[in-house]
Amino acid sequence: MGTPNDQAVLQAIFNPDTPFGDVVGLDLEEAEEGDEDGVFPQAQLEHSKALELQGVRAAEAGDLHTALEKFGQAISLLPDRASAYNNRAQARRLQGDVAGALEDLERAVTLSGGRGRAARQSFVQSGLLARFQGRDDDARRDFEKAARLGSPFARRQLVLLNPYAALCNRMLADMMGQLRAPSNGR
């Protein structure tokens, strides 16, 4: 029958337009995420979220200095909240500080207990950094964790990292090309 990952590869090859969630067993659902922020005082939480939003907007506008400043303020306000570390990691990566980004991602995973939205995003970012550095085994491990936490992007990355899927995709593309453009002898 094959593993759920094998089934996901075949699903992606033969039915590329269907969502990966259709593969039985691939959605290894985590227990209810719950409210990750419920443990923080409401006023501080709202201020921290506002600072993060300002940081995200600054990063989107290309002002990484301000973004890092806002994320740092959010971290100072609630140092045990994973989300700001995850956001700061993204800004650090954009600034070229890969080591700093990885430190923040590790911290976010630790604070989140490896569960919830912040952990899922951290595993995706860590997987992307590993992939960009050519560390495909590390990328695969991080994407597997993110996929278990519900990330469809991580699932797609896992399929792309599978060498058998790459070979099958190449063979299928060649075969489809031959079917669309038959040789002159026919």
UniProtKB/Swiss-Prot annotation:
**Keyword Repeat on entry:** yes
Sorted alphabetically, the Gene Ontology BP terms of this entry are: central nervous system neuron development; memory; negative regulation of proteasomal ubiquitin-dependent protein catabolic process; negative regulation of protein polyubiquitination; tyrosine metabolic process; visual learning
What SUPFAM superfamilies does UniProt report for this protein, alphabetically? TPR-like
- Keyword terms, alphabetized: Repeat, TPR repeat
Q: Where are the TPR repeats?
A: 48-81, 83-115, 120-153
InterPro entries given for it?
A: TPR-like_helical_dom_sf, TPR_rpt, TTC36
Query: Pfam families in the record, alphabetically?
Result: TPR_8
Q: Record's family?
A: Belongs to the TTC36 family.
* Protein name per Swiss-Prot or TrEMBL: Tetratricopeptide repeat protein 36
Species, as recorded: Mus musculus
Name the encoding gene, please.
Ttc36
